[in-house]
Curated annotation (Swiss-Prot):
Organism: Schizosaccharomyces pombe (strain 972 / ATCC 24843)
Coiled-coil residue spans: 104-157
Cellular component, GO annotation: mitotic spindle; nucleus; spliceosomal complex
Top-level taxon in the UniProt lineage: Eukaryota
Family classification: Belongs to the SPP2 family.
Encoding gene (name): cwf28
Protein name per Swiss-Prot or TrEMBL: Pre-mRNA-splicing factor cwf28
Quaternary data: Belongs to the 40S cdc5-associated complex (or cwf complex), a spliceosome sub-complex reminiscent of a late-stage spliceosome composed of the U2, U5 and U6 snRNAs and at least brr2, cdc5, cwf2/prp3, cwf3/syf1, cwf4/syf3, cwf5/ecm2, spp42/cwf6, cwf7/spf27, cwf8, cwf9, cwf10, cwf11, cwf12, prp45/cwf13, cwf14, cwf15, cwf16, cwf17, cwf18, cwf19, cwf20, cwf21, cwf22, cwf23, cwf24, cwf25, cwf26, cyp7/cwf27, cwf28, cwf29/ist3, lea1, msl1, prp5/cwf1, prp10, prp12/sap130, prp17, prp22, sap61, sap62, sap114, sap145, slu7, smb1, smd1, smd3, smf1, smg1 and syf2.
Swiss-Prot/TrEMBL GO biological process terms: mRNA splicing, via spliceosome
Biological role: Involved in spliceosome maturation and the first step of pre-mRNA splicing.
Amino acid sequence: MKRKAVLEAFSDSEDEDEKKLKGPQLITGFSAEEGVHYQNETIQRIHEKKRAPKIIHIASDENWMEKRKARFKKKETEVHEKPSQLPDSGLNYGLNIRVASSSAADNEIVDWKANNSNEKAQNKIATNKESTDILPEEVQLVLNDLNDDVKSANSANLQPITTNVVNEKDAYRKDIDELPEPSNMKDYSEIPVEEFGAAMLRGMGWNGQLSSKDAFDVNQRPTFLGMGAKPVDSELTELDIWKNPKKTMFLPVKPLESNSALNSQNEHTEVQKKSNSIDNLTPSSELFRKRSRDNNLSRESSVSSKHLDYNSRNYNKRDRDPDRTKYREYHSERRKQHRTDRYSDDYYQGRSYSYKKRSHRSDRYTERENPDRSYRSTRTL
């Protein structure tokens, strides 16, 4: 409710200021820092208030988890006081050295006083019981009431059970009541979009100054550039790159200093001379003789390489087994004899049927001439 009242008060004042600014006003001057200067001081104050930097105050950083735990936490029913000092056990192992200490003497005195007080209290209770038995009933009732009051006073020292447990519905209602009021269109119009971020930073404590560190510029990587590669300086021309070549396997070819046009012309003339000399060859010319002699030599060398003798291959110079050479010569002669004998008529006599080619042909002719004669009979003969 308080928040609503404050907002209504501010809204009323803002409405009045807007009404004042709507009418015609006298302007005395302009400036880059302050802007327009009005003659009326109240209007000038309203204008400066609008030009002031906007601030969006942010709520404190509250830990809502801890807040929720504290809300739904159950406290202990009783808190028992711990003894100041635990009694020392009588058993001590190892080397025992008695040291006179003031604390031990104080403990003995405290224990003696406590024992005396307990004995006195017990004696009082016993005497009271004995005396109450002697007293009349009315007096005994009054004494019992007094004893009950004393017991209740002693029990007041104990902490009562204080459960701070809240239902989910109550907690939800409380959170809704603590929520701020929703923003209106008027609130959005007061803070422009371009000033929203700066207003939030001012609410967090920003003083409006930029940091001393230089901003990091994110440069986009060039296309088709591999990982770890560096782009070539675009300022250097191709000629500047070739002046200072790096030590690499590739060696650029430098152009000749002479004029390329003259060189090409000289080459053309030389080629033309050669072509003319080849066309004008005659059997009597020396060039023709040289060419023919070279051709004959090359032809003879090719023929001799195809038909080399056994001795020309230098097989006899090698250390070979003489029996192997004899065996090779014997079989070579036998193959030659076989080639000459296979075309004679007596070569296939006495061999198997697979070699009787000539007899097979003759049998075919006999079948045509004498059909009554069987082909198998001729085969078996």
